[in-house]
Amino acid sequence: MLGVINRMAKKFNYKLPSMVALTLVGSAVTAHQVQAAETTQDQTTNKNVLDSNKVKATTEQAKAEVKNPTQNISGTQVYQDPAIVQPKTANNKTGNAQVSQKVDTAQVNGDTRANQSATTNNTQPVAKSTSTTAPKTNTNVTNAGYSLVDDEDDNSEHQINPELIKSAAKPAALETQYKAAAPKAKTEATPKVTTFSASAQPRSVAATPKTSLPKYKPQVNSSINDYIRKNNLKAPKIEEDYTSYFPKYAYRNGVGRPEGIVVHDTANDRSTINGEISYMKNNYQNAFVHAFVDGDRIIETAPTDYLSWGVGAVGNPRFINVEIVHTHDYASFARSMNNYADYAATQLQYYGLKPDSAEYDGNGTVWTHYAVSKYLGGTDHADPHGYLRSHNYSYDQLYDLINEKYLIKMGKVAPWGTQFTTTPTTPSKPTTPSKPSTGKLTVAANNGVAQIKPTNSGLYTTVYDKTGKATNEVQKTFAVSKTATLGNQKFYLVQDYNSGNKFGWVKEGDVVYNTAKSPVNVNQSYSIKSGTKLYTVPWGTSKQVAGSVSGSGNQTFKASKQQQIDKSIYLYGSVNGKSGWVSKAYLVDTAKPTPTPIPKPSTPTTNNKLTVSSLNGVAQINAKNNGLFTTVYDKTGKPTKEVQKTFAVTKEASLGGNKFYLVKDYNSPTLIGWVKQGDVIYNNAKSPVNVMQTYTVKPGTKLYSVPWGTYKQEAGAVSGTGNQTFKATKQQQIDKSIYLFGTVNGKSGWVSKAYLAVPAAPKKAVAQPKTAVKAYTVTKPQTTQTVSKIAQVKPNNTGIRASVYEKTAKNGAKYADRTFYVTKERAHGNETYVLLNNTSHNIPLGWFNVKDLNVQNLGKEVKTTQKYTVNKSNNGLSMVPWGTKNQVILTGNNIAQGTFNATKQVSVGKDVYLYGTINNRTGWVNAKDLTAPTAVKPTTSAAKDYNYTYVIKNGNGYYYVTPNSDTAKYSLKAFNEQPFAVVKEQVINGQTWYYGKLSNGKLAWIKSTDLAKELIKYNQTGMTLNQVAQIQAGLQYKPQVQRVPGKWTDANFNDVKHAMDTKRLAQDPALKYQFLRLDQPQNISIDKINQFLKGKGVLENQGAAFNKAAQMYGINEVYLISHALLETGNGTSQLAKGADVVNNKVVTNSNTKYHNVFGIAAYDNDPLREGIKYAKQAGWDTVSKAIVGGAKFIGNSYVKAGQNTLYKMRWNPAHPGTHQYATDVDWANINAKIIKGYYDKIGEVGKYFDIPQYK
């Protein structure tokens, strides 16, 4: 059970994951139950640990309710949440609501919009809306958006001297007269409700809608804001692009309680919104934000109820972070500002916050990254001011637009395109909105079904409606997703069972309701009488009949899904080509003996084992075949005309002695059906890859709609005379042949590479380029030019700028005596500037004056495969070609006379640099420091047995059918960084070859130079060891140390620094295992695991299960084994040996036992009963199922959350002081020694290490 090991109190409410219990022995460790909720830390800047799972689920559900994207509902009846009220609005004498002060007064003609009025509510969040005009009925939309720059990376374009932003006095005008007052609380029981809906009007060219609201008076002059208003720009629907593995931590005030929003820009002129998001997802451990915005889209990338890592340790627990993606023309920039303002106003409105600029006093709800740097610290970035100024725009203008958007959404000023009343008119007879039902409103999730009675009160759009609307949807079964109680009335929200389309709210007394459990997948055959009715839904009515069972006598019903409604079981399946639901009472299990013999043999396949697996291949159906099968259980297939065509194969299935392929249309998701293996010509296929290559092709060559296409799939023929240009954009390997997709003369299609002429490859040589590279000369282009150069920053320089327009540069000392890539060049005035890029991440750093640099031309990288000897006198291995002494990875002495394996080369000015590997490190060496080997006499040694598991380190290498052969070699790209289990070794011509098994089970030969005994990756943290140690030592709850056994005291700075010193730890053979990647299986042989598990109780001989679990869920095998051994007392605990829970009591002698080997859900109050209950619910009736199922839980819960080493769990170097799993400074050391001990006993070593590096 979780937590049976050392319940000591050194965690201070940090959550310790269940899987970390593997090493929870020794000092200061606590294993809380896996499903226990995390509590918020009381650590000032670290109050960001995820709230309880129930709170999280409730919050996600509530958020989803207000973010449900809907279609345009103008003039359409739609479902609304119970919180939405539709007030009446009066039509008064009107004037033009176009902004008049500092804004053009031209009338803007647009679509007729709904009138709007609103009341505010401080007791519940306001539903998000993205409409900048009067919001339409049910403007529940999704959120999105962010741009990617690592806040913790010092090498960023954002890092600009804060002094470059003038701290002008805060304009009093920004404290607008429209500033939303705090909502007034009512004394009555009915909660106040904010509404964004109004009577929807159909779109037409009718008169402009009228409103009694005042017009907005801009507080700053802005031609761009005027352009936005005059053109009545609309914000796009917010898209959601969430990533499951992003961590979810609460803000310092709790889940769903941000304090404001921060304006960022991406600092990358070349990026796109998709590129930024893609990069962020791959590097989220360093930084991720909530949303990205450009001129066309708003994409929310992380739920705004939880914090993100975008603005430093102080700001992250407080603010929503949103990035502006760079645009390059006036209209696009204006749209992006409109989109950002609308998104920001939506967030403020949703979370009950009012716009309040923090730019000039460090207090408020709207911040720039610069303001966070200036007033809060934890970051030194100054965006977005430089980017905004480059478009003649300012933060004050953006804030004014946010404020206006907010006031429009809150119903305090007139929307754009409407008319306003010059003086409010008092109606002769007061008209007040319908008063909603009184009483407290409660809404809860529900998972049931209901049938609406013939006599009913109708469907309600909201539970506040006085009357429902008549409906014909009676005596049908619907799904129920919510219940709501308002006063004494109870309602159900009903929706279509199959599509999820919501119909509306119905009163409890108007339905027949039943509870329902969630459907589960099954694979079972039953016997069913002909004539039995099938239904479109479980518990269906006569209005939901899907059909009747045809035939005579009993038929076979193949069930694929099951659901319990109240106490009845319903199954979904197929019979004679018809599908539907039927009560289990009408089915007979075919496994049971029949009372009389059946003259015809029963379906033989139902008693055979079915195995199904994914497949990536292609197939052509033979002209003679057995037809297409709807399921592999079918006795006969249906005739098909889809013969002699190429289809994609997505699955293969084996049933009894038959093997089937599932074929689908190659270009669409349309499934064709199952075909027998003997009825097709099958070929393996690799996944298509994007390419950008030009070939020549002869006229008349056929193009096909699919790769390996047949005459029935011709897309056309190449026209013209003589060779034509074929521009390829995609490539796929089918068996051993390559096919390319491209365009020629306006026609597109696939063609075999054999019909294409490949451009000559560049020569691979270390010799100096044939043509001398011209010396770099300064040019002064009028616009920004893309260049390929490389530069060294001089020790004495004038500094770095965010843009060429910055008058004052930030100190550039940190970049001095270092080499960087140059990607852009621009003249400004009489000076020329170039944009330097980070060498490892290709992230722009900033602009330098060329006078501060030594610049050379940079050639194109060329692949090469050559082995060299490093000269005794050399300049070392560098991180970058033409690198300086500050960028040396290995000094000259460390690589002298060593073997350097080159993989690519590039020219820098007149020199050539090669990139390759030496001493297990990769980097650049000047060609002058290398000597090519002399030819050796061919020699071949006999192959000998050799058992060792290596790691494939060169994805550009190959594996071979026979060693030293170029005729049968295949790319290692798909196996890069995967284990390779070697069984033989052979030396041929001085090259060592290893024969072994790839991760997919295939046997192959690989060169020793493409393998490594271990794969170590070094990650730069961007901080010094002193800085991170100071953060840890300064936490409110101090790191702990035992100077006297059993007595805990606060650790001092030196204790922490010593414990965090990665250089020292990496040199220790045992402590190095702090850096072992726990999310990377090593393919340790099952035999070795079983040898180790001998005598370990029920875990004995479970090597196959641990191996399967590791491969399926990407978890280190030793880590899993260690965890299981500690949790089960070496496999002897009753929880591991198994039991059953009957009538809520544990029964250990039952026929069926359920096992729990990781202690999941084994809560302290009754660990055995709770743990067995969980195992029973999960179906773990064997030890192997408990191992595999438990591994899934562990992997999904913690290891994949980013902190995938013991060191990261303890110290979290990406965000020091936050989300750490222990307080004992020796915690990672103790656990690393334990894991190393297990490796030694198994007879293996760790293969994958991830080591943080400090400056």
From Swiss-Prot:
GO terms for cellular component: extracellular region. It comes from Staphylococcus aureus (strain Mu3 / ATCC 700698). Undergoes proteolytic processing to generate the two extracellular lytic enzymes, probably at the septal region on the cell surface. It comes from the Bacteria. It is found in: Secreted. This is Bifunctional autolysin. Residues 776-1255 are annotated as: Endo-beta-N-acetylglucosaminidase. Gene3D superfamilies: 1.10.530.10, 2.30.30.170, Peptidoglycan recognition protein-like.
